[in-house]
Amino acid sequence: MSDLVIETKKLTKIYGEQTAVNSVNLHVKPGRIYGLLGRNGAGKTTIMKMILGLTPITSGEVDVFGQNIKGHEKRIYPRIGAIIEAPGFYPNLTGTENLEIFAKLRGTPQPNAVKNALEVVGLPYKDKKLFSKYSL
């Protein structure tokens, strides 16, 4: 079993004649925060969408929590999250309130999931700070 949270192996996406992502290998360790940097059109969003199972993979593999997601993409949804491009949060609610709404919408069964997620990234639980006041 891998000690990686996310691993991609030769991840590739081709749209017609255009290669959007070419043989990308990522290794994401637990407890760390990562970001993808690059110019417009570099394939960052496409990579994230392939990892999340939202865009079909042309070739290569994605393993999440040591398991290949091919054919089981929805199985990983309760355990992962991502902000792609612009966050879709309610500015008049707190960060905790936003996360609790999205956890319910996604059917996250763990009662402490939001609290645990906030602890991982070093944010306070039940903070009164509105999302509109967060710095992205």
Q: What name fits each language-model region?
A:
Residues 38-43:
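Walker A (P-loop) phosphate-binding loop of ABC-type ATPase nucleotide-binding domains
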Residues 60-71, 75-76:
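Conserved ABC transporter NBD signature motif
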Residues 18-19, 74:
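Short coil-to-beta microelement around the adenine-binding A-loop and adjacent beta1/P-loop entry
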Residues 100, 104, 111-126:
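Conserved ABC ATPase "signature" region
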Residues 52:
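Helix-to-loop junction immediately C-terminal to a conserved catalytic motif
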